[in-house]
UniProtKB/Swiss-Prot annotation:
Organism lineage string: Bacteria, Bacillati, Bacillota, Bacilli, Lactobacillales
One example GO MF annotation: lipid binding
Protein name: Chromosomal replication initiator protein DnaA
The encoding gene: dnaA
UniProt: ATP binding residues: G154, G156, K157, T158
Region annotation (Domain II) ranges: 74-109
Region (Domain III, AAA+ region): 110-326
SS bond partners: none
Family note: Belongs to the DnaA family.
């Protein structure tokens, strides 16, 4: 049997091979080996969140590595460092009071009670974002500040943002946490000017420990609001207060966002969240079904997950639809019933939800450009403009992410899609011919 330090070193190498750098830093570097005795391994972790994550996601590797090194199963045990403190032990004996305080603080911070780390399903598309969120929640204002999540609609950016707020309030019940959408920030700023309460507005936003701002891209063209947010950002950052932002695209791809803000957003960590793969979609549905106490066979969940691949909101909406269909018809939930329930949804989707390929085909026919050229690399104007219009329409008329759109045009980078979108926007403002052509193509796509 190896000693605990050499066994831990082997484990570190095993995890380093399968985890991203932020995940490795979040889970492995924060863990301390205590004892290895009689095939039992004791590890000290910094929080209950870390313990839960280890138990759910990382324990199997301990058993696997132990078997390789010793020929026997090594069983892990986790000790939370803070639970050694008598003060915390006393708090754990009185959970009801703590829950009330937590609930009141969460409501005051405008946090959604459903959006916690416990309800978040981890997959390949969000693993790094989840790890970074946990790091920030456990140690705000230090490593990743600001933390910037970006990705398409309904992929979990807001969920992670709220989860950070909840966890910080669990760790620091007296912390001042504020969640706000960019629209609300703008409206409150304008109102403070009209009512001459600007100083009160600044105190509210600059005297917080954690500021969560959703959909920051909508501030891009609001000059006065951006100026106010710039100073708010600086004040909080200089005081080592944590800032978390979300957007549908990376900071440097947000049109008309001032360079001074782009550079500040880059001071921390920017993480993209991509659509969930099939396994993650099934796990999301299982978690939702368990929360709703629904009895659904695995093959039925797999069927539903196979029908919806766009985002988590639509996926959960499909499950609600199946549940309602079963209740109305007084039937058990089966794959056959799910197919009937989602039939009309797919029918509506086929009419109203365009694919990138449909847009490409329509543009190809309209301009008499071969589809392979539209997706290819030819740079002649008769092909470049239709290609840019295709990218523009894909951005405007679908929920696909920038990388996804780029991939459908011969593997182009997402910055190419951004450039195409901006180029066509500019042409639409001054070129009547382009206005007419884009309008006609839109009508064809909507007909």
């Amino acid at each position: 049997m190896p000693d605990v330090e050499s066994f831990w070193h082997s484990l570190e190498e095993a995890y380093q091979a399968i985890l991203s750098a932020p995940s490795f830093d979040a889970w492995i570097k924060t863990t301390r080996p205590l004892k290895l005795d009689n095939n039992q391994l004791w590890l000290e972790v910094p929080s209950a969140v870390h313990r839960d994550y280890w138990e759910k996601n990382l324990s199997a590797k301990i058993v696997e590595t132990g078997f390789k090194l010793t020929g026997a199963e090594v069983m892990p045990h986790f000790v939370v460092a803070d639970e050694k403190d008598a003060a915390l032990a006393q708090e754990l004996e009185e959970p009801a009071e703590e829950e009330v305080v937590f609930s009141e603080q969460s409501k005051k911070a405008m946090l959604n009670p459903k959006y916690t780390f416990d309800t978040f399903v981890i997959g390949k598309g969000n693993q790094m974002a989840h790890a970074a969120a946990l790091v920030v929640a456990e140690d705000p204002g230090s490593i990743y500040n600001p933390l910037f999540f970006y990705g398409g609609v309904g992929l979990g950016k807001t969920h992670l943002m709220h989860a950070i707020g909840h966890q910080m309030l669990v760790n620091q019940p007296d912390a001042k946490v504020k969640y706000v959408s960019s629209e609300t920030f703008t409206n409150e700023f304008i109102n403070s000017i009209q009512t001459k309460t600007s100083e009160q507005f600044r105190k509210e936003y600059r005297n917080v420990d954690l500021l969560l701002v959703d959909d920051i891209q909508f501030l891009a063209e609001k000059e006065a609001t951006l100026e106010e947010f710039f100073h708010t950002f600086n004040d909080l950052y200089n005081e080592n207060k944590q800032i978390v932002l979300t957007s549908d695209r990376p900071p440097n791809d947000i049109p008309k966002l001032p360079e001074r803000l782009v550079s500040r957003f880059a001071w921390g960590l920017s993480v993209d969240i991509t659509p969930p793969d099939l396994e993650t979609r099934i796990a999301i549905l299982r978690k939702k079904a368990d929360a709703e106490r629904l009895e659904i066979p695995d093959d039925t969940l797999s069927y539903i997950a196979g029908q919806i691949d766009s985002n988590i909101r639509e996926l959960e909406g499909a499950l609600v639809r199946v549940q309602a269909f079963a209740t109305i018809n007084g039937e058990d939930i089966t794959t056959s019933l799910a197919a009937d329930a989602l039939k009309s949804l797919k029918s509506v989707g086929s009419k109203n939800q365009l694919s990138i390929l449909q847009i490409q085909e329509e543009v190809s026919k309209y301009y008499h450009v071969p589809l392979k050229d539209l997706k290819g690399k030819k740079r002649v104007k008769t092909i470049v403009v239709p290609r840019q219009i295709s990218m523009y329409l894909a951005r405007e008329m679908t929920d696909n992410s920038l990388p996804k759109i780029g991939a459908e045009f011969g593997g182009k980078d997402h910055t190419t899609v951004i450039h195409a979108h901006e180029k066509i926007q500019q042409l639409l403002e001054k070129d009547p011919a382009i206005q007419k052509e884009v309008s006609e193509i839109k009508n064809l796509l909507n007909s």
